[in-house]
Regions:
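Short aromatic-enriched loop/helix-cap "lid" or pocket-rim segments at secondary-structure transitions
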Residues: 52, 62, 129-133, 149-151, ...
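Secretory-pathway/luminal and periplasmic proteins that interact with or process carbohydrate-rich
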Residues: 47, 71-73, 129, 198-204
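Short, structured coil segments at secondary-structure junctions
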Residues: 133-134, 175
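Extracellular/periplasmic catalytic domains that process cell-envelope and extracellular macromolecules
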Residues: 4-8, 33, 39-42, 56-58, ...
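Active-site-proximal cap/lid insertion segments
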Residues: 3-9, 16-32, 142-282
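Active-site segment of extracytoplasmic enzymes that catalyze sulfate/phosphate-ester chemistry
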Residues: 13-14, 20-118, 137, 143
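Short, polar loop motifs at secondary-structure junctions
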Residues: 123-126
Length: 283
């Protein structure tokens, strides 16, 4: 059975992608549905003053994993080469590069200490083809982001496209890992569930229509910060973000992605509670 030793608790780490701190009920947002994130906040600790090492995906993730700032670990921007992307998109002809080679991640330490480590979801720190940093279970997204349906994935058999909604699939794989741990001896586990949600795309065809339509038709989005200056690349590429309908469409997909991610967090919490492991699992 997974660990019931209170000195060696199990660990579940959920990482979302591009989620604003205002997008939860526990943060005062009355329009979005996040009962499970609110449930965690009510029984745990919610930081109100928190700083990220980088506003960009790959360096921020590398900092979380290594405890180092970008100038120390060397990843300064989102990775477009040397990753599985280079091999998946044949025209790039790039080699696979493990950008954090030679650096210790906290999952390395956990694995060395006897933890069984599993990762389901987004990696985006180089060479997604091969398990790294102490992980023995490895079912990850090929790229740094992409479609919610037919998402490119990699497992032990190579790359494939997943037809189902990818947020659900990440959780399916996470529960597969947990089930295997529940059948093992008293070994603590670490599970990383790295959702691509709520990163774009946000169009209706990328998400379950019923939820997208509910937000599009019913939500005033008054809880969403407005009037912020768009990122430089948004202005440079001329991406429309200021007209009312474009804003409503984007936010409908954004809120949908968060609500459905929250529902999947609930699936993991429910599994832990059903197995009697919730009290001995850091979440």
């Amino acid at each position: 059975m997974a660990s019931r030793d209170t000195t060696r608790p199990n660990i579940v780490f959920v990482l979302t992608d591009d989620q604003g701190c205002w997008t939860m009920g526990c943060a005062g947002n009355r329009e979005i549905r996040t009962p499970n994130l609110d449930r965690l906040a009510a029984t745990g600790t919610r930081f109100e003053n928190f700083f990220c090492a980088s506003p960009v995906c790959s360096p921020a993730r590398a900092s979380l994993l290594t405890g180092r700032i970008p100038s120390q670990h060397g990843v300064h921007d989102w990775i477009r080469a040397g990753d599985t992307t280079a091999k998946y998109e044949k025209d790039r002809n790039g080699e696979l590069v493990e950008y954090l080679a030679g650096m210790t991640g906290y999952t390395d330490v956990l694995a060395a200490g006897g933890y069984e480590c599993g990762l389901s979801g987004k990696w985006h720190m180089g060479d997604s083809h091969h398990p790294q940093k102490g992980f023995t279970y490895w079912n990850v997204h090929v790229k740094g982001g992409g479609p919610y349906y037919n998402a490119p994935m990699v497992d032990g058999d190579g790359t494939y496209e997943e037809p189902a909604y990818i947020t659900d699939v990440f959780t399916d794989h996470a529960l597969e890992f947990l089930e295997a741990q529940s059948a093992s001896e008293d070994t603590p586990f670490y599970l990383g569930v790295h959702y691509t949600a709520p990163h774009s795309p946000w169009s209706r065809d990328q998400h379950p229509a019923e939820t997208w339509d509910r937000y599009h038709e019913e939500c005033p989005f008054e809880s969403t910060p407005d009037g912020l200056k768009p990122a430089e690349w948004v202005e440079r590429l001329g991406i429309p973000v200021k007209d009312a309908e474009t804003r409503r469409s984007h936010l409908s997909g954004y809120y949908t992605a968060i609500e459905l991610m929250d529902a999947n967090v609930g699936r993991i919490l429910d599994w832990l509670e059903a197995k009697g492991l919730r009290e001995n699992t850091l979440f």
